[in-house]
């Protein structure tokens, strides 16, 4: 009877913690969104004032938006602390769920290597994502119709991405994850240069097929190797949380920069924009080389 009563008490405590986690998430996200919404009008005034002060509207916009992001994160964090202090969720449970997986990552790899790996994760897809944000607008500007874009870019491109994913998986098994990770990053950067050629040629369905084939094939290959790489970094005890953190970090900076793709194109044009996205891949290649020298990927793959 004592065991049954204890089990029921534990189940009730687990349900309370689950409800607490849910409420903490809802309140924190609501605070995050509300922070952006309530600061929208003030942000416009701040951008105008800062733009006149530093004589650079693009930099002023970026600085104000980063400040709004920081403020929203602080608000979300404070709300989470209030929920914890209220007793809706146990602080120990929050530590085990969110803090311990992060501590585990830094303890296993050490601070210097851990930051190197996080930098690699955060920058690996930057070339593809920043370019991809403006891709559809680019196709329309060249004169391609929406049905043509849907047929070539979406349908045919998806097929090439799947093929690239299979190829990336097979090559990772055969030659190792980091080698294919490097190859994927290199090809992703190089294929962005093909869009420069498409800019010069203009409307050409054959060339569009060639460019999409190369771009999506390399993207699929890189994605497969990257997923294998992320999986090898996680601890089996914290797989879900650590992988979720890595996946979020993977798109954070690229998505932020991608939001300014249109402004960049208006400023420097498509040719220089595609060149700049290709050059963004160079630091990634350097990080992969450094990571390869610092830890044994084969040991991780066998773990």
Question: Where are the language model's segments positioned?
Answer:
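Intracellular juxtamembrane helix-capping segments at the cytosolic ends
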Residues: 1, 220-239, 245
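Hydrophobic/aromatic end-of-helix segments at the C-terminal termini of transmembrane alpha-helices
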Residues: 46, 130-139, 226, 230, ...
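C-terminal ends and interior cores of transmembrane alpha-helices
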Residues: 186-203
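Short amphipathic helix-loop junctions that connect adjacent transmembrane helices
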Residues: 44-57, 133-150
